[in-house]
Design a protein with these regions (language model features):
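Active-site-adjacent structural elements that line small-molecule/cofactor binding pockets in enzymes
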Residues: 1-216
Length: 216
């Protein structure tokens, strides 16, 4: 956990060293992670985020509103992102969520969804690489609740159904990945952040990054 003062000071150091290149992402995390060491600490995430932003704004070197984005999924956090930040950076979402997020944010704020990708044409290989990875996130209530709001069923989440897997993880060749990116853009995304998974989760997926860079 970081204090508003720590975050504002780190932002100031980064911009002083590297210019106006850094966009600060702020997220409230998840109850199972926060409460693991301090049970009961995770309460009222919307109010906690607003209070954290108040703290940043009260520092000697506040982070400009347009240089910070919120890890927003639900309508209330998206509304806060529109009011108090430069936009939203949703994680583990579909193009349909991007469409709803754009409607919630309005035309001005940035919308920067994450899209997980696996560069393989083999469905079995894609599922072998991505299913356990996805299962870990489905155990976190914030993501699970957002997917339930998005029309997936409890069975989809419990079984990591093919329908859910294919909606959250884009797999295939570069053309297939770019089609998914285009769907997000058509739904209102300003930028799509690609996270590449590979057979070795401990290795940087440099080959995948290079292939995606050429395709993009």
């Amino acid at each position: 956990m970081h204090t508003p003062e720590d975050v504002a000071a780190s932002y100031a150091r980064l911009t002083a060293a590297h210019g106006d290149r850094f966009l600060l992402g702020i997220g409230v995390s998840h109850a199972p992670l926060i409460d693991a060491d301090n049970p009961g600490r995770y309460r009222k995430p919307l109010a906690a985020t607003a209070s954290f932003l108040d703290g940043i704004d009260a520092t000697d070197q506040p982070v400009p509103v347009d240089r910070r984005v919120l890890a927003a999924l639900g309508p209330k956090m998206l509304s806060l992102a529109a009011q108090r930040a430069g936009g939203a950076h949703p994680y583990l979402v579909t193009p349909d969520h991007t469409h709803r997020a754009r409607a919630a944010l309005g035309d001005g704020p940035l919308l920067l969804p994450e899209q997980t990708v696996i560069l393989t044409d083999d469905a079995d290989e894609a599922r072998k690489i991505g299913k356990d990875w996805l299962s870990a996130y489905l155990a976190l209530p914030n993501y699970a609740n957002n997917l339930l709001r998005s029309g997936f069923s409890a069975d989809d989440l419990a079984q990591v159904s093919d329908r859910l897997f294919d909606a959250i993880i884009a797999w295939g060749d570069e053309e297939a990945i770019m089609r998914r990116v285009s769907e997000h853009v058509a739904a209102g995304a300003d930028h799509v952040c690609l996270q590449a998974l590979s057979a070795d989760p401990t290795a940087f997926p440099r080959d995948q990054w290079r292939r995606l860079a050429v395709a993009a």
